[in-house]
């Protein structure tokens, strides 16, 4: 689904299928052809991995969790253990993966979670790294509107009315 217009994709495949691809935990969308310009192996930022890592041509949230969780454990958690504050900026799907991992959110619950774009999410963790408190920063009405906007991204125009 990378690089595709969400509304046009919903018109082509149907809202239910696009929602399944975008929000389910373990259903991958169709893979990109290897010669597709959107293939990460053809993108400049990923050239440093050429020959060392096979970059995926499709990914579901389960795959993202499998990448995010070890990164959190090896790179982020040690900094927090040293008392550092850590700022993470990421795509919504990576944030969903991190939330699932940190908050132990069920597969079904994560399917309905919409991450608002550009809204800071703050975690307060206990010493054992369980979540003490998590919440978005900002005006609740604006945050709700941003969550709703993300939810509506793959809904066809005529169904919004």
Question: Where are each of the predicted segments found?
Answer:
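Short glycine/proline- and acidic residue-enriched helix-loop micro-motifs
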Residues: 4-8, 17-63
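Short catalytic/ligand-binding loop motif for oxyanion handling, primarily in non-cytosolic enzymes
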Residues: 29-31, 95-98
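Short alpha-helical linear motifs
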Residues: 46-47, 88, 160-161
């Amino acid at each position: 689904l990378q690089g595709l217009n969400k509304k046009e994709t919903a018109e082509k495949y149907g809202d239910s299928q696009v929602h399944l691809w975008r929000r389910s935990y373990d259903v991958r969308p169709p893979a990109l052809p290897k010669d597709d310009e959107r293939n990460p192996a053809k993108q400049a930022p990923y050239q440093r991995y050429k020959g060392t890592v096979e970059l995926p041509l499709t990914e579901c949230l389960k795959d993202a969790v499998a990448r995010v969780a070890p990164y959190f454990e090896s790179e982020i958690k040690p900094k927090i253990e040293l008392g550092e504050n850590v700022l993470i900026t990421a795509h919504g799907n990576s944030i969903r993966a991190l939330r699932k991992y940190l908050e132990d959110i069920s597969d079904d619950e994560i399917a309905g979670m919409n991450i608002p774009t550009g809204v800071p999410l703050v975690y307060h963790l206990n010493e054992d790294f369980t979540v003490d408190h998590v919440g978005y920063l900002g005006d609740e009405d604006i945050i709700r509107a941003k969550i709703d906007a993300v939810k509506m991204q793959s809904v066809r125009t005529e169904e919004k009315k």
